Every structure is written in structure tokens, then in C-alpha cells.
Amino acid sequence: MHVFYAVIDNTIDLECLTLHKGVEYGCKLQLISKNTKTVNIKCITEVYYSDHLLKPLMAYVNDKLIQLDRKKLRHKIVYSIDLTLYDEVTNMLVCSNMDPDLIDRYYAKICLDFDNNVYTVKDKNYTNAVIEYPVVCNFRRYSESDSDSDVDDRAELHKRNNDSDSDDYT
């Protein structure tokens, strides 16, 4: 199973951006700010089965390809950028595939109005996109570390949940 989500300035969570079917990722963002503003954008892809590969992401701002910082962890890849908004409206596309049909018909379209703190999903398309603002932060989810202790914790939890004695009721 693949998961794709984004975090803006650690305060806005764009969740459930994964397509209902397939292994492509993407979303279209409309960023609105009348003043010059720098926003930190993190796009995260995760895989829950290690035998699946994560596809790389590309980003375009106002139709120009931009470079994302990429940090590969054990089960996820975090792409990030500090993007300075100069225009009143900045359009950003983050995607794993430049197929116009995917972009227009399948990826979510999201509007982030920083002037009025209004963040809306304009069109979910083939996703279940939702916005959480302000974020009630789950630090592990937004962390850019994937330490062995986190993996050990998940393994222990999995072991306890699959313990045959756990089905006994007394």
C-alpha cells in the first residue's frame, strides 16, 4: 500500500492524496498570498510493504520545473522545499507522472489562501483529499527520521496484536 500526503509549514496537513487505484502520486496546489511569503512544503510518500518501490516526485511552479530536496528513509521519502511566493497566485504541481489525463482528471486540486487562512479542496477527483488545519501533530508522522527504535516499536506492536493469547477473554 502506498500513501501520499503533504505538510505545509508544519501547520496545514493535506491528507489522503493517494489515488484510489494505481501507484501514481500528485496534486495541484494554488497558493495565494498578496505579500511575499516563504512557505515550507513537504511531500511525503510512504510504502507499507517493503517489496514495493516508491516513484520519484517532480514539482513545477508556474509551469517551471523546480528542484526538491529529497530525503530517503526506511519506508518513506520526504521531498521538501522552502518556496518563496512573489506572485499573488502561485500554481504548483507535484506529481510522479506528467500524463495530462492524470493531472486533470485524477489528482486533487487544493487552494491555500494564506492571507485569509482559508484552505480548501477545490476538487478531490480520484482521491479522498482532506485538509487538517491547524494540525494536531503526530510527531512520528511528520518526523524526517526513521530510527531503528521506531521500527522496533512497530514490530513489537505487530507481534502483540498477532499474539494468539490476545483473543482469549476472561
Swiss-Prot record:
Annotated region (Disordered), positions in chain: 145-170
Regions of compositional bias (Basic and acidic residues) in chain numbering: 152-163
GO biological process, one term: viral process
Disulfide bonds: none
One Pfam family linked to the record: Pox_C7_F8A
InterPro entries associated with the record: Poxvirus_C7/F8A
Signal peptide limits: none
Similarity comment: Belongs to the poxviridae C7 protein family.
Known function: Plays a role for multiplication of the virus in different cell types.
UniProt-recorded name of the protein: Probable host range protein 2
Species for this entry: Cowpox virus (strain GRI-90 / Grishak) (CPV)
